[in-house]
């Protein structure tokens, strides 16, 4: 024990000396010199208390990260971004140490003066309980001089996230070693986080911004034909391929891969197929040659078709009950395609205690015998529609992070939708050191944003994303195309967006007003009873009922469970309330998937959520029943109330009648239209009106199996009599190629504008020859107009983090309960 203590003490000394030398401090021969600062042990006989080291670990993290970022700043890394003025300068003069027992916590102004802009101090940091340093003001461009206030800083030990280790390795093949691999397997279970190796991690991350090393245009034109591909790449796809290959071959990096975040419709799938062909597995690598593609269910057949028709690669779909039989031959295929649901299912089976009450050890032994996707060490892992794992705590995110592989890629046109912390889940999956450690992300991104350092946070994010992410928008490519004189223009059709203001008829207006009044009364009861937070899910139900009333009054007569895509009833409804307080509005809307009104002990009105008397046997309260009776008086055909033409139904039929003759002879036939709605019940109502009008159509929603969905798409593409696709926004907004249509109707607005953009880009993409017409239906003076305001907040957030926004900053990353109240009454948000 004594020898071990000596060795540990010696190691700490060496680490401290090395750390000081990095800042120009000569430590030779100074071990026994005393200073006015906290001293190091004078000899090897003096032990270092383990508890002391452990207690100071957390306190020093801020200093180490500060020095690492400061060092990077001195090397003038070019991020191609405009300079952002930070709130406090960085010092180069020695710090003056002072302390007083009566010292109180600093106010906001003093803390801002003292803070290092590259390492904000957490409000919970232990630094407030110990001597602190007063930082003199100097120019940010001056070199940092010697530091004498950190002599006693000790290395900090942080645990590596479990998903980054080899704990889920079940394969029989040779496991890679630290010498012949790039990924996280082979590293110890704990890593020493000091300013030196943190700086090294950051150097590895920022030293190769391969966007600056893209080949010239002549090389791009020569390499547009990729051996093994049956099509020619466009210029921007060749440039993208150059970047993709560079990220997989970057030298001495602990992470190979990144985020391909091109706009929807620019060919991310084609670029990845080209990467698979142009950068195969080297023979010396200890992994299988296959690339694993994880995609939503609606896209797996499209991936298979793209791989097989546009390249010589072999592909197999890993899905269905008999999928385990494929594991014996899976290594023979170039591309293996599966879904997030399958991945979660197999991951959960590896993380349970087993069946029949087995112990964890027995269960682990049992699962080793059962093969799965986690038994392989993949050459490449691709997450299509990677924003699926935006919630770092979701099973999808945990399962994806548990996969073993060398090169890791995220494909998404919307890498950020609600708040900047969504990026952490992608960074964690990609193993981007040091930001894949949650404590580093919290200290460098989350806490500074909460403390008002928006400019600093967004500058850091843009610096990080400039290295690991390639993002090209359609507007940017069209603006830059052909500037070099090569004529390599990206030719996309125009996208014309029309906001259609729908006006209620008098009967509809009275119905909506009465409904809103009933719901405001229910909200008042929630507020007066002091149970507003506990009724979070009920509030969302009220909001969705109001949105349904904007579409068609009869939509409210459908039960929740009938609307598969909007409510998709699942088990576990009792847990929704405790989750609600920590979720964003977009995530809270997904909680409605667990709503089961009929399972509650108390009875509530299915329309306004008002509590019903114990002996009341109707599903609607008296006020809501009276409201429907008033509406029925204006319906011409009482036998079929769904054939009543609401304001939106009238606008939809009017838009479908606007087919005019195309001037371009190469484009013939009537326009085909995609009608998107979040409510399958509203699609059912549109279905009836299209049948009555004699308009040919097909369906694509969550109540259909995958084979039926593919059949609908084939009819839309090949049958001239099929003019309309009624599509669920949840099912059809991701990945589909619908260039056979040239018109989009968005029947209802959604909290998240990125979902709407994805839906539009199913039609407006490469291969579209017609101008795309987009009609967004919004009913005036209703909840829909307020939802549009919330959409604008989320757009600003995404623009700021991705570097293409205005100077104004989105200061609130969460939409709170007040935002929900605002949707009912503007005064509630004040």
From Swiss-Prot:
GO terms for biological process: DNA repair; nucleotide-excision repair. The modification Phosphoserine is found at residue 712. Residues 662-816 form the Helicase C-terminal domain. One of its GO terms (molecular function) is helicase activity. Residues 1-61 are annotated as: Disordered. SUPFAM superfamilies: P-loop containing nucleoside triphosphate hydrolases. Keywords: ATP-binding, DNA-binding, Helicase, Hydrolase, Nucleotide-binding, Nucleus, Phosphoprotein. Residues 1-12 have a biased composition (Basic and acidic residues). ATP binds at residues 262-269. Gene3D superfamilies: P-loop containing nucleotide triphosphate hydrolases, Tandem AAA-ATPase domain. Its EC number is 3.6.4.-. A motif (DEAH box) lies at residues 384-387. One of its GO terms (cellular component) is nucleus. Residues 249-433 form the Helicase ATP-binding domain. Belongs to the SNF2/RAD54 helicase family. This is Uncharacterized ATP-dependent helicase C582.10c.
């Amino acid at each position: 024990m004594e020898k071990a203590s000596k060795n540990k003490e010696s190691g700490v000394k060496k680490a401290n000396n090395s750390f000081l030398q990095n800042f120009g401090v000569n430590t030779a021969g100074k071990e026994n010199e005393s200073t006015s600062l906290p001293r190091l042990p004078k000899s090897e006989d003096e032990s270092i208390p383990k508890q002391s080291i452990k207690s100071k670990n957390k306190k020093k993290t801020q200093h180490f990260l500060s020095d690492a970022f400061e060092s990077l700043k001195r090397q003038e890394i070019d991020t191609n971004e405009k300079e952002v003025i930070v709130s406090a300068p960085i010092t180069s003069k020695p710090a003056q140490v002072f302390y007083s027992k009566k010292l109180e916590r600093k106010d906001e102004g003093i803390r801002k003066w003292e803070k290092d802009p590259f390492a904000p101090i957490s409000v919970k940091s232990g630094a407030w309980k110990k001597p602190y340093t007063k930082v003199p003001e100097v120019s940010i461009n001056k070199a940092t001089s010697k530091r004498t206030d950190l002599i006693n800083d000790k290395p900090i030990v942080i645990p590596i996230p479990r998903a980054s280790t080899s704990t889920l390795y079940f394969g029989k093949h040779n496991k890679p070693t630290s010498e012949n691999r790039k990924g996280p397997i082979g590293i110890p279970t704990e890593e020493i986080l000091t300013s030196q190796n943190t700086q090294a991690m950051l150097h590895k991350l920022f030293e190769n911004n391969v966007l600056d090393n893209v080949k010239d245009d002549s090389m791009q034109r020569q390499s547009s034909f990729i051996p093994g591909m049956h099509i020619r790449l466009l210029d921007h796809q060749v440039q993208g391929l150059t970047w993709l290959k560079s990220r997989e071959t970057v030298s001495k990096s602990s992470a190979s891969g990144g985020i391909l975040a091109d706009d929807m419709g620019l060919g991310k799938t084609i670029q990845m197929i080209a990467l698979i062909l142009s950068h195969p597995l080297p023979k010396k690598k200890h992994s299988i040659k296959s690339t694993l593609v994880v995609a939503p269910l609606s896209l797996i057949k499209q991936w298979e078709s793209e791989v097989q028709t546009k390249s010589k690669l072999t592909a197999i779909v890993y899905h269905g009950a008999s999928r385990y039989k494929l594991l014996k031959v899976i290594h023979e295929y170039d591309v293996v395609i599966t879904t997030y649901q399958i991945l979660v299912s197999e991951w959960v089976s590896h993380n349970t205690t087993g069946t029949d009450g087995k112990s964890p050890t027995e269960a682990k032994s049992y699962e080793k015998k059962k093969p799965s996707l986690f038994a392989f060490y993949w050459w490449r892992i691709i997450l299509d529609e990677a924003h699926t794992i935006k919630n770092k705590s979701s099973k999808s995110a945990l399962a994806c992070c548990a996969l073993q592989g060398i090169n890791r890629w995220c494909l998404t046109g919307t890498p950020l939708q609600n708040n900047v912390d969504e990026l952490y889940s992608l960074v964690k999956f990609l193993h981007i050191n040091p930001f894949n450690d949650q404590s580093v992300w919290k200290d460098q991104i989350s806490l500074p944003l909460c403390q008002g350092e928006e400019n600093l946070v967004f500058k850091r994010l843009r610096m990080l994303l400039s290295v690991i992410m390639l993002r090209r928008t359609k507007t940017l490519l069209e603006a830059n195309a052909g500037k070099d004189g090569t004529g390599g223009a990206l030719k996309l059709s125009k996208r014309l967006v029309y906001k259609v203001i729908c006006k209620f008829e008098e009967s509809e207006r009275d119905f909506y007003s009465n409904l809103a009044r009933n719901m405001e009364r229910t909200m008042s009861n929630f507020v007066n009873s002091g149970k507003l937070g506990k009724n979070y899910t009920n509030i969302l139900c009220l909001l969705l009922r109001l949105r349904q009333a904007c579409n068609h009054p009869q939509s409210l007569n459908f039960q929740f469970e009938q609307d598969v895509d909007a409510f998709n009833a699942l088990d576990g409804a009792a847990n929704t309330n405790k989750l609600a307080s920590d979720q964003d509005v977009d995530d809270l809307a997904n909680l409605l998937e667990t709503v089961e009104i009929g399972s509650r002990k108390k009875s509530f009105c299915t329309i306004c959520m008002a509590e019903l008397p114990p002996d009341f046997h109707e599903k609607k309260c008296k006020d809501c029943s009276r409201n429907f009776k008033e509406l029925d008086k204006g319906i011409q055909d009482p036998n079929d109330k769904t054939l009543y033409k609401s304001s939106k139904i009238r606008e939809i039929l009017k838009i479908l009648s606007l087919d005019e003759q195309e001037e371009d002879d190469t484009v013939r036939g009537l326009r085909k239209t995609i009608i998107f709605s979040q409510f399958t019940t509203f699609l059912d109502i549109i279905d009836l009106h299209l049948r009555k009008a004699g308009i040919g159509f097909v369906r694509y929603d969550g109540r259909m199996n995958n084979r039926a969905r593919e059949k609908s798409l084939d009819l839309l593409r090949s049958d001239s009599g099929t003019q309309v696709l009624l599509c669920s926004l949840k099912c059809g907004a991701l990945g589909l190629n619908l260039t056979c249509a040239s018109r989009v109707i968005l029947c209802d607005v959604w909290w998240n504008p990125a979902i709407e953009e994805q839906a539009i880009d199913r039609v407006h993409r490469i291969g579209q020859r017609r101008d795309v017409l987009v009609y967004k239906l919004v009913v005036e003076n209703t909840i829909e107009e307020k939802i549009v305001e919330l959409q604008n907040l989320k757009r600003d957030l995404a623009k700021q983090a991705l570097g293409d926004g205005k100077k104004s900053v989105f200061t609130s990353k969460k939409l709170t309960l007040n935002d929900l109240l605002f949707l009912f009454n503007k005064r509630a948000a004040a």
